[in-house]
């Protein structure tokens, strides 16, 4: 066996960022990757979808994707060429709690990401059914696209393919789209997408996917129930966007003494170290803390989608950096509860902190302040007047608690508020910060 300081399984955003950070601080790192470096985000996720979002046609989007993805992948490979990093191009498999493949180390990070989760309904294995990767691999634009699931993935693809010219229908089990977003923002976005021609069937449960012969050829339908009525929609392609599940198969976790939680995630403590005891069936491990041991040297960690905490590429990155800091004995001030998120529809939506509904449910006193894009000079000049900002803050001191934005460049705007919340700043301090005129950022200081 070859000894090293740190083993990382998975070269996605969390894995390769942790490797680069550890190498910079003098650790010898071995990182395993059985597929392309960069993970889902770079190869078949956030980056390819953004080339679609910012392309004028389906053909242009595919061409740009084939240029952008290899370029960024080459950048990741360059990062991993650091003299302190050894990239092993094979899947990392545990031999024991300190050994992966032919390498042994005191510290191991599992950063294997997640994969699409399909719903168990008849016909789900039909050739017309694809996940997000399959949709990105389509060579021709579908005339009719049915999307099952109105989460971030489903809504982004609905927006993009509608703009490309597909007839898009979305079927969602819940009463509103984007359950992780503020309900007010989610509703406004859905209404705007409906105006663009997308059909939404909310509070609807998919029952089956069936195909039948017809004089014009094969017909495929999605059968669903809505308020007791049996309905159906025909589609040429059916995207299943009903969530993701952690990638844990084939890692031989049992050899390392690791037991999955009931939801198939790897349970971790507040430092993302894998909990030493097997979780009980139905036990909530999200807040469970295992005893710390100094700087945590001699531990196995799980970061990113595989621990189920926050399934976001940037969450995986900061979790990886935090783990390396703990291994090195370095304290940091990363606030994992202040985690911004965005959806790149047209218009965009973004958020950071608890929604208005969550604040009410928690009994947290708060004030809500709003402003609208239609009153912003830059938005008017751009022709992007559909949008709103909602800032929640404490009633007395005015400390910022959350931000919820719907409109052009929402993902960029929310980042400023994220910084203020992280620093414990107030709404007054935000308002008293000078903003360039004319910019969309002025909507933040124009709240009532």
PLM features: residue spans?
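FAD-site-proximal beta/loop scaffold in flavoenzymes
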Residues: 125-141, 232-277, 281-287, 291, ...
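Flexible, glycine-rich terminal cap/loop adjacent to redox cofactors
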Residues: 9-14, 18-35, 40, 47, ...
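Core beta-strand elements of the Rossmann-like FAD/NAD(P) dinucleotide-binding domain
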Residues: 2-4, 101-107, 228-237
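Rossmann-like dinucleotide-binding cores of NAD(P)H-dependent redox enzymes
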Residues: 68-73, 137, 142-146, 152-212, ...
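Glycine-rich dinucleotide-binding loop and its adjacent helix/turn
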Residues: 46, 112-167, 171, 196-200, ...
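Short beta-strand "acidic-cap" motif of Rossmann-like dinucleotide-binding folds
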Residues: 27-33, 110, 166-172
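N-terminal Rossmann-like dinucleotide/flavin-binding domain of flavoprotein oxidoreductases
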Residues: 2-4, 40-102, 181-207, 356-358, ...
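Beta1/beta-strand and adjacent pyrophosphate-binding region of the FAD-binding site
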Residues: 1-12, 141-151
């Amino acid at each position: 066996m070859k000894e090293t300081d740190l083993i990382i399984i998975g070269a996605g955003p969390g894995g390769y960022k942790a490797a680069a950070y550890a190498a910079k601080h003098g650790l010898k790192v071995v990182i395993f990757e059985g597929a392309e470096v960069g993970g889902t985000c770079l190869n078949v996720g956030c980056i390819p979808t953004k080339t679609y979002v910012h392309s004028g046609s389906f053909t242009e989007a595919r061409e740009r994707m084939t240029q952008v993805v290899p370029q960024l992948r080459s950048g990741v490979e360059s990062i991993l060429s650091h003299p302190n990093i050894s990239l092993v191009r094979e899947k990392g498999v545990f031999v024991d709690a300190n050994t992966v493949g032919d390498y042994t180390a005191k510290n191991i990070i599992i950063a294997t990401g997640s994969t699409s989760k399909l719903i168990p309904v008849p016909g789900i294995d039909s050739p017309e059914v694809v996940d997000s990767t399959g949709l990105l691999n389509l060579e021709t634009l579908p005339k009719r696209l049915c999307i099952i699931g109105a989460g971030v993935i489903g809504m982004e693809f609905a927006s993009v393919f509608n703009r490309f010219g597909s007839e898009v229908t979305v079927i969602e089990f819940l009463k509103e789209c984007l359950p992780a977003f503020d309900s007010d923002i989610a509703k406004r976005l859905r209404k705007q997408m409906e105006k663009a021609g997308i059909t939404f069937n909310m509070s609807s449960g998919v029952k089956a996917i069936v195909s039948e012969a017809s004089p014009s050829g094969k017909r495929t339908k999605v059968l669903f129930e809505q308020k007791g009525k049996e309905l159906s929609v025909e589609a040429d392609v059916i995207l299943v966007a009903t969530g993701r599940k952690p990638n844990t198969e084939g890692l031989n976790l049992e050899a390392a003494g690791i037991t999955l939680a009931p939801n198939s995630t790897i349970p971790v403590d507040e430092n993302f170290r894998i909990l030493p005891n097997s979780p009980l069936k139905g036990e909530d491990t999200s807040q469970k803390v295992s005893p710390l041991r100094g700087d945590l040297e001699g531990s196995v960690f799980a970061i990113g989608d595989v621990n189920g905490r926050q399934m976001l590429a940037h969450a995986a990155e900061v979790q990886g950096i935090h783990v390396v800091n703990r291994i090195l004995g370095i304290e940091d001030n990363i606030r994992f509860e202040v985690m911004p998120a965005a959806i790149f529809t047209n218009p965009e939506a973004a958020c950071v902190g608890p929604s208005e509904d969550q604040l009410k449910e928690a009994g947290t006193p708060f004030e809500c302040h709003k402003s609208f894009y239609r009153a912003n000079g830059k938005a008017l000049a751009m022709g992007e007047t559909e949008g709103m900002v909602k800032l929640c803050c404490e009633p007395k001191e005015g400390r910022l608690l959350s931000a919820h934005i719907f409109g052009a460049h929402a993902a960029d705007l929310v980042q400023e508020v994220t910084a203020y919340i992280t620093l414990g700043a107030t709404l007054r301090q935000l308002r008293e910060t000078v903003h360039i005129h004319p910019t969309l950022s002025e909507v933040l200081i124009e709240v009532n």
